[in-house]
């Protein structure tokens, strides 16, 4: 019996925050602030059996893009993203795999992108609170900012999520990114193509980070098994 495919959806979103709403630190974007803008982003639905390796050459060709400048309104952009994710959830159900839900994967998504999407779906009337609860439970999330904690020597006893560039400096050292705040200026200057290219590269790096972390986990588990076998061999 063949194993049903499970989608791992790598994604990255961008926002615009007007000057009067900008904070020095933290997430300045608020999905309920009518002056803020949800710019959209890209999603890459990867097959668990075929795409979770480091041999992908054309990342952009595997991505689905949703950008504000390609839609008449923010509401229609949000609606398009909602139906895209709903379709992925339905595909999982049709595959008959009830134990493994579609996995949403990114860096820092549990405190930013995922809550933002749910609130945008509520704001534009696509979900009420009970339906939002059901919707989010059709998915599972994997935040590399948390998963990567074990891949670093922590200087104290506080296990704290790692920043995007901290993770990328280990797994894609040739590619680092400016703060997401740089996108605000790009949007004001209408440099939309640069924003699009940035997001494609961010998702590519997230995918490479996923593969790199998986390889590290397997390596460490291999060392653990070797140590166990050595202890058993020389146990008196």
Question: Where does each model-flagged region fall?
Answer:
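Conserved non-catalytic scaffold segment of RNase H-like nuclease domains
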Residues: 2-119
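Short, low-complexity, polar/charged sequence segments that are solvent-exposed and flexible
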Residues: 27-33, 123-126, 161, 227-228
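Low-complexity, flexible helical/coil segments
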Residues: 44-51, 140-145, 233-235
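Short C-terminal domain-edge/linker segments immediately following a structured domain
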Residues: 39-47, 135-139, 228-230
